[in-house]
Amino acid sequence: MQFTALLAALGAPLALAASIPAAAHNHSMIDVQLAATGNSMIKATITNTGDRTLNLLKFNTIMDEHPTRKVMVYQDGAEVQFTGMLPRYKMSDLTPEYFVNLGPKASVEHSFDLAATHDLSRGGKIVVKAHGMVPTAEENATTITGHTLYESNELTMDVDGKQAAAVEQAMGGDDSTGVIDKRSNIVTSSCRGSQLRVLQTALSNASRLSRAAASAAQRNPSKMREYFKTADSRTVQKVASRFLSVARESSSGSTGRTTYYCNDNRGGCHPGVLAYTLPSKNQVFNCPSYYQLPALNNRCHGQDQATTTLHELTHNPAVVTPFCEDLGYGYQRVSALPASKAIQNADTYSLFANGM
């Protein structure tokens, strides 16, 4: 995967990001066009449609360089299984390499192979589209101050299944084996030093926070409207049920449905990643930076081990169905999501639990 910077009008190089008021970030300031460049290859062209420079954070967007969920893929009206990773990124201490500077009317291209993160072995016609929210920072800065939305064109492709099946899966490989702990199926042989104790504490705290959040969802309609944008009975029931499912998984005695690793063995712990999930396998992996987080954060909406574990468990279809995605990060982005997306956003659940 690679970024290819395109020249802006008059051939000027990409400028540094300009200051953009956060209030102006609720609409789309970028255009995303998808094009097929091979059997399962996609080229995404991202264009700044405005008259000011944008500083775009790549995490969990169409520009993410890692095997994350960049697009939705459908075949015969059903979603094609995603086999890539769903990471939780550390949102503090961001550095410039996590951003793309995009001048007015300038574009960048990002290419990726769908077959590396989707099972396309069946072959045939597929439909691909992308949508999301890109966090933005101000000029010469790395503090997130706003966001912009995007929605791509709908692309139809005819895939050769045999050719797609020959593409190496980005997060593939045989399932690891090891000694399993009874709680949430922790692979204890993956833990070093105090990591097992830290993870067990995080799971215990995640269970406690999830039960409290389930109760708050049922008793505090104003908080439901703040985070999930509605307090109707159906949404309340669904949110509470999901929190209780996370609580059960976090405290399971011997029936855990996820497999949790203290350390990464699939190469997904890229810079900035706290932990990640493989939803196709119901597996969660902690990264070294996870152990630098506090067990619990007293700062409202601050990241910690407990809510990171809670966040990752919502990515697992064995716990939450359909599993939650990464549609918005941080309180400002979460609070901008409509109800239909808030309920499917992993960070909405972790922030709600942290804020109770």
Curated annotation (Swiss-Prot):
GO cellular component: a single term: extracellular region
Disulfides per UniProt: 191-262, 269-287
Binding residues annotated for Zn(2+), in chain numbering: 311, 315, 326
Matches recorded under InterPro entries: Fungal_M35_metalloproteases, MetalloPept_cat_dom_sf, Peptidase_M35
GO biological process: proteolysis
Keywords: Cleavage on pair of basic residues, Disulfide bond, Glycoprotein, Hydrolase, Metal-binding, Metalloprotease, Protease, Secreted, Signal, Virulence, Zinc, Zymogen
Propeptide, residue positions: 18-183
Signal sequence region: 1-17
UniProt main location, coarse: secreted
Textual note on the cofactor: Binds 1 zinc ion per subunit.
Name recorded for this polypeptide: Probable neutral protease 2 homolog ARB_04769
